[in-house]
């Protein structure tokens, strides 16, 4: 059985296939982007919505960027920060020496009955 990964990003699908060691079918469908500070809530909403449209088990993902100096912002709203002020704008907001950041990826799997969620965190610094 091929894993259906709902994403518009070919690179994410290739990377997931490589990491999981299985064949991935990338499917791009329109999904509502809910507003929440809880990445798990966002991912679960996307997974259930994707399953409702496709009627097959699905995997989805979303990301969060937690900048320590900004109290965890922009969090799951990173896409809107990026579109609004860009990478340089985010970097310009940081004045203190601590420019540490957590890049969090949340993955969700939903088969119509069971939702599973996992997060991966990469620690880094804003240049």
Model-derived regions, located:
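Anionic-ligand binding patches
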Residues: 2-4, 11-127
